[in-house]
């Protein structure tokens, strides 16, 4: 009984208080119907037969200070953006953030736990977005290249609160393309001379080469103390030639990544394919040490090139000196995505199984703005997206860069909600008039995006009605909320002191679903590893 279509007609409407972009108001895609209809649902359709908390162990969390003698990789660098605290809806009714489809934090966390290293750089949204969810996909003739799904249920770690799960699902239909113009930009500096770096890099790119054909071209640039062009616009079906270059790579020297980036973008521009997919794929540990090397210096360089229509994908490798903050910044400012490759299986996931998502953009500069109804929500906080938050006025600013979403990608965000007391006052936005003030809506999701290559945005609006609340959330909700709870426990969030890895594990294990690739089962195993290490 999973709702599969937009509930209500698609109609044109003027955005309340907005005049900037074409706006459509769409009835939110509810992952569940009204609560009364849920009693007949069974586990087979993703719904839980048991109540939400039945049989769940409420053991305490394992805070980071209990990691005893577990070492930390002190040379690794991560972004330290502060976690968002609760916001009062009466004074801050809007929450705005840029979309993010990166998944690097999850595979890096997996590497850290398997290595026996205390977790660092845990970004909630990247853990959640690592997994697939059964969101409805847009119809082939849909006006917008995505759907929006909202579901709200009780918070597992704070039963007096609620959790809102918002999912933006992009169409899996990739744009018509004249072929791929791809530049491999490969770090072959001395720091890459480790089995889990350059050899894994070469094997990973061999997998990618197998996905290409005669309509594609590949250039290969390497950099260490200086950069070198090893291939220039080689047809994709000359796989043997490309693989031979990859197998002969050797590491040595310093890391002049900025010059390598410059050369890679120049090659991409020289071979630019109008109507095609033009992309630089950077593979590195991020340890730039010659020339511009800080995230700020590199993003200044990247932003100029991002305007040219050339996208970037960043693949991180290795451990010990990983500069996660640098690689994430390059991807965020370069119209790109960022994945961390810890195993060949992960390379296969990113470069083969998710090839279209990694390579083809269907929505550019996608921003999300959530407007909360003070009649139903007193306070809220966004879980994750700590370095993707935007000022509210930046939502309408078409010059403000945001995240790009690939074919088949999904963007999932969780909000923790404090319910309003009965008779709460209303704000002066969508819920300002008397009739709206009596609304039982929880929130309204505004999504703003550009078609690839367009200069102006379109805004679509998805209200979340009272019917999206359920006491029997879907297996997707239960699993994803378990990922969130585990992340909160690992990071020792002061706003979720009761977050429990034990409870997260039990909920995740009970919500594995089909799990075709075994990724959800693997997550359960990672929680076990975490608890063993933390003692």
Predicted features, each with a name:
Residues 1-21:
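N-terminal secretory signal peptides that target proteins for export/translocation
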Residues 8, 20-34:
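Sec-dependent N-terminal signal peptides
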Residues 37-40:
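C-terminal motif of bacterial Sec signal peptides marking the signal peptidase cleavage site
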Residues 42-50, 146-365, 424-435, 514, ...:
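Exposed acidic/Ser/Thr-rich ligand/metal-binding surfaces
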Residues 88-91, 95, 103-108, 360, ...:
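Long, acidic serine/threonine- and proline-rich intrinsically disordered regions
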Residues 311, 332-342, 347-409:
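Polar, glycine-rich mid-to-C-terminal structural blocks
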